[in-house]
Curated annotation (Swiss-Prot):
Gene coding for it: ING5
Keyword 4Fe-4S: no
Origin: domain of life: Eukaryota
Subcellular location: Nucleus; Chromosome
Region span, Disordered: 116-165
InterPro entries: ING_fam, ING_N_histone-binding, Zinc_finger_PHD-type_CS, Znf_FYVE_PHD, Znf_PHD, Znf_PHD-finger, Znf_RING/FYVE/PHD
Role played: Component of the HBO1 complex, which specifically mediates acetylation of histone H3 at 'Lys-14' (H3K14ac) and, to a lower extent, acetylation of histone H4. Component of the MOZ/MORF complex which has a histone H3 acetyltransferase activity. Through chromatin acetylation it may regulate DNA replication and may function as a transcriptional coactivator. Inhibits cell growth, induces a delay in S-phase progression and enhances Fas-induced apoptosis in an INCA1-dependent manner.
Tissues where this protein is expressed: Down-regulated in bone marrow cells in acute myeloid leukemia patients as compared with normal bone marrow cells.
Protein's recorded name: Inhibitor of growth protein 5
Any single GO BP term: negative regulation of growth
Any single GO CC term annotated in Swiss-Prot or TrEMBL for this entry: MOZ/MORF histone acetyltransferase complex
Binding site for Zn(2+) 2: 202, 207, 229, 232
Organism per entry: Homo sapiens (Human)
Annotated positions of the N6-acetyllysine modification: 114
């Protein structure tokens, strides 16, 4: 019964995942198409400029080159948005994997506790073990349930009930995020952490870090124009 409730709970948690993934992949395809359209526009603008450059005035040349540069900037913006979206998608899937790992660990621990309790009762310690164990579990379940109700949104109610189900439902989302991450996952930013939330890329092509979390560089929205990370800005000042 506990296994069925555990499975139902996890399936509920990933119910919207396919739709979210489909949406993100669709957005990435749209960004790809926009980039291709803009590249085709750049080819046309470049061909026109080359064929007419001798007849253009200096101001007209600057104007045509500015259009080409703006188109390239737009291409880079689309590419940055696509990378950002890909990182968010990776984070979304990784969060569910880590949650599954956490739930499996708790499920195995619960089974182990029940098996140990059963062995103890069969060896003659039934009354003392059972009474003390139930008292401790009631206290633990009560605290867990209050934490869940106060700190997390209301979840769909499940039919039936068990100590294991109560334990799973009382797990705070932060417990999942605190699980160890994949050691092979790349790290970014000044904090040397994995990708999460909104991130921004440094426009210095030689930047050793490349990507930064908004909060770590005191950003709340994506700035207009080029952006350089604090480390690259400092290096640039030293060279002056």
């Amino acid at each position: 019964m506990a296994t069925a409730m555990y499975l139902e709970h996890y399936l509920d948690s990933i119910e919207n995942l396919p739709c979210e993934l489909q949406r993100n992949f669709q957005l990435m395809r749209e960004l790809d198409q926009r980039t291709e359209d803009k590249k085709a526009e750049i080819d046309i603008l470049a061909a026109e400029y080359i064929s007419t450059v001798k007849t253009l005035s200096p101001d007209q040349r600057v104007e045509r080159l500015q259009k080409i540069q703006n188109a390239y900037s737009k291409c880079k913006e689309y590419s940055d948005d696509k990378v950002q979206l890909a990182m968010q998608t990776y984070e979304m899937v990784d969060k569910h994997i880590r949650r599954l790992d956490a739930d499996l660990a708790r499920f195995e621990a619960d089974l182990k506790d029940k098996m140990e309790g059963s062995d103890f009762e069969s060896s003659g310690g039934r009354g003392l073990k059972k009474g003390r164990g139930q008292k401790e579990k009631r206290g633990s379940r009560g605290r867990g349930r209050r934490t869940s109700e106060e700190d997390t949104p209301k979840k769909k109610k499940h039919k039936g009930g068990s100590e294991f189900t109560d334990t799973i439902l009382s797990v705070h989302p932060s417990d999942v995020l605190d699980m160890p991450v994949d050691p092979n996952e790349p790290t970014y930013c000044l904090c040397h952490q994995v990708s999460y939330g909104e991130m921004i890329g440094c426009d210095n092509p030689d930047c050793p870090i490349e990507w930064f979390h908004f909060a770590c560089v005191d950003l709340t929205t994506k700035p207009k124009g080029k952006w350089f990370c604090p480390r690259c800005v400092q290096e640039k000042r030293k060279k002056k």
